[in-house]
């Protein structure tokens, strides 16, 4: 969880009051043994600039959770490559928020 908090700030410029574990699994089944853990972050506060390391290009886009699926579909239609895992993780986040 400490690594997730650190990465959230470094990559997005936001910190979270609460991190709720969602799921963990291999980054790429059969191709890698790297395991990723995902969290739902709530109680967000902007604490600095986003961007990650010097060799990373990160753009933070704020989209209400109710609009994320449509946003991703439109991004794909516009030629953006969206990792398919993102669609599943958005649904897990929606379900967790509904509980």
PLM regions: where:
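The catalytic Nudix box helix
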Residues: 1-21, 39, 55, 64
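Short helix-loop capping/hinge motifs at secondary-structure junctions, enriched
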Residues: 45-47
């Amino acid at each position: 969880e400490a690594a997730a908090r650190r990465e959230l700030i470094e990559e997005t410029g936001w910190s979270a009051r609460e991190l709720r574990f969602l799921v963990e699994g291999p980054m790429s089944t059969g191709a890698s043994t790297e395991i990723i853990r995902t969290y739902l972050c709530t109680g967000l506060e902007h604490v600095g600039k986003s961007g990650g390391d010097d060799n990373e290009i990160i753009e933070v886009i704020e989209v209400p959770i109710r609009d994320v699926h449509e946003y991703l579909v439109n991004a794909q239609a516009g030629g953006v490559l969206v990792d398919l895992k993102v669609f599943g993780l958005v649904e897990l986040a929606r379900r967790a928020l509904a509980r």
